[in-house]
Amino acid sequence: SALPRKALLEDKLFDGVRASIYHTSESRLLLELSTQERTHTMVIDRDWQEVQSDVLMDDPSDFFFINRLVMIVYGVAIAPHHMLKIHASVTELEGNALLFLGTSGTGKSTHSRLWRKFVPGATLLNDDEPILRIMEDGEVRVFGCPWSGSTPCYRNASAHVTALVH
């Protein structure tokens, strides 16, 4: 991007994708996602009211970039609404949810799959990026979302959080 970078806030490499977040001299945030083949950027104004990206959807790989960029913006935009996107696999049973937390590869999805296999009525609510929300009455609920993990699961549903298991 042509925007001057003022300060690097975060730089992570995961699954061959580098994500770098910078402050710009115009007090905006610049998010840069890079693979070996391509780099795309997104610029967010200081109030999170306007987001611009250079993704043109003119290459098959652009879906990956736009999906990641939207996921990141969504995760920040929901915070003022008492919501948090987390990394977990969620098993639902009779309206109650168990959230299995941990880093990638620790068995969250496997644990959820075993619940579905051995506990009658257990279902998968989300397998990677569920949304936690503190409701006005103080109840904590978990919601499915458009992002899932190793098991495709895109449910527009929610359940009462009974336990967080790490």
What are these model-derived regions, one by one?
Residues 108:
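Conserved lysine of the Walker
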